[in-house]
Regions:
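Structural recognition of alpha->loop->beta junctions
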Residues: 210-224, 262-282
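Extended substrate/RNA-proximal surfaces in nucleic-acid metabolism proteins
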Residues: 2, 58-212, 268-275
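A short acidic, helix-capping loop that chelates divalent metal ions and anchors anionic groups
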Residues: 94, 259-260
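An N-terminally biased module of ancient metal coordination in phosphate/nucleic-acid-related enzymes
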Residues: 1-79, 162-164, 176-177, 182-259
C-alpha cells in the first residue's frame, strides 16, 4: 500500500471519549494514545467538545500533541454522513449553538429508540443506555448495554440486529445540513474532513457528487486511512482524494479498548501520492 515503513510521526485524527460514545475519559484516552506511540491525537467526539479541556491537560502531561476536534452528524440526500472538524475552537459560539441543537435531536432520538425496545418487550434498555452515558445517549450506548446484558455478543451485532437502518429499533433523524456543518467548522477555525467514507456504500457517481458539494462548501479533506477501511478501500479513497484535490487524513475512530478492529493509533500509513491534512501544520 505504498509506504511500508511506519511514519516517523504517528497521527490519529479520529477518536472518541466518554464525553460522547467512547468508554474512556479524555485523560485515559490520551494516556492510552501515548502508550500506543501516538504523537498527534485529535479528540473528535460526536457533536460535542466537552472533553477538550481535560484532553489538553492530559496531552501536556503525556508529551503528545493534541488537536481539538469534532465529529458532526450531517444529513445529505437523506443519508447520514459524518464530517470531522480538525483544529476547531471549542469556544466558538455559532458552532456551539449548532451542537446544542444536534444534541437535542440525539436526546429525542434516544427516547424514540427506547420506546421501540419497549414495544418489542425490552423495557429496560433505554434506562440502561442512559446509565452508560456521561452525556447525550447515542446508539452506541444502547449497543453497549445490550452487550453488557448478554443480548448480543458485541457492539457490531447489536447494530446489525437492532440499531442500523432497516432494523426494528432504528430511528432516523434529520441532522445538520452539509452547509451548516462546514460553516460551523470553518467559523471555529477548523478543517473539514469526510469521516470513514467507504462506510457509506455510495455509488461512484453519487460519492463524486457528494465530494463536489463538500469541496464547493469548503471541505478540504477525506479520511483515507481508518480502521473501517481495508487496503483496497484506502487505495480507492486515496484515488478520490487525488482526483478531487482533497487532503488525506488518518484516524482509528477509536471508541473502546474492547473493539479490536479499531485500536488507538493503529492506522495504515497513507498511500503514496497523498497530500496529508497535516502538511501545513506548524
Amino acid at each position: 500500500m505504498g509506504n511500508k515503513a511506519l511514519p516517523s510521526i504517528c497521527y490519529d485524527l479520529h477518536s472518541h471519549s466518554s464525553a460522547s460514545d467512547g468508554v474512556l475519559s479524555p485523560t485515559a484516552l490520551v494516556q492510552l494514545a501515548a502508550e500506543n506511540g501516538v504523537d498527534v491525537l485529535a479528540l473528535t467526539d460526536h457533536d460535542c467538545t466537552d472533553g477538550h479541556a481535560e484532553a489538553v491537560a492530559a496531552a501536556a502531561e503525556a508529551g503528545i500533541r493534541f488537536i481539538p476536534g469534532i465529529e458532526i452528524s450531517v444529513s445529505w440526500h437523506k443519508r447520514l454522513i459524518h464530517v470531522v472538524g480538525l483544529g476547531v475552537d471549542g469556544n466558538n459560539s455559532e458552532m456551539q449553538q449548532g451542537l446544542v441543537d444536534l444534541r437535542a435531536k440525539r436526546t429525542q432520538r434516544a427516547e424514540e429508540i427506547g420506546a421501540k425496545f419497549t414495544k418489542i418487550g425490552m423495557p429496560d434498555v433505554y434506562e440502561g443506555a442512559c446509565a452508560l452515558a456521561d452525556g447525550v445517549v447515542s446508539r452506541s450506548h444502547f449497543a453497549m448495554y445490550l452487550v453488557q446484558q448478554g443480548v448480543v455478543k458485541d457492539v457490531q451485532q447489536a447494530f446489525k440486529k437492532y440499531l442500523q437502518q432497516g432494523k426494528r429499533c432504528y430511528v432516523g433523524c434529520e441532522w445538520a445540513s452539509l452547509e451548516d456543518a462546514l460553516k460551523w467548522i470553518h467559523g471555529a477555525g477548523g478543517q473539514a474532513v469526510v469521516a470513514h467514507p467507504a462506510r457509506y456504500k455510495m455509488s461512484r457517481t453519487l460519492f463524486r457528487e457528494f465530494l463536489i458539494d463538500f469541496k464547493v462548501l469548503g471541505g478540504v479533506g477525506i479520511e483515507v486511512a481508518c480502521s473501517s477501511h481495508n487496503l483496497e478501500e484506502a487505495t480507492q479513497m486515496a484515488a478520490y482524494a487525488q482526483e478531487m484535490g482533497l487532503l488525506a487524513s488518518a484516524g482509528s475512530d477509536f471508541h473502546s479498548p474492547d473493539n479490536t478492529w479499531a485500536k488507538l493509533g493503529r492506522v495504515h500509513p497513507l498511500p503514496e501520492g497523498c497530500q496529508p491534512i497535516w502538511k501545513d501544520w506548524d
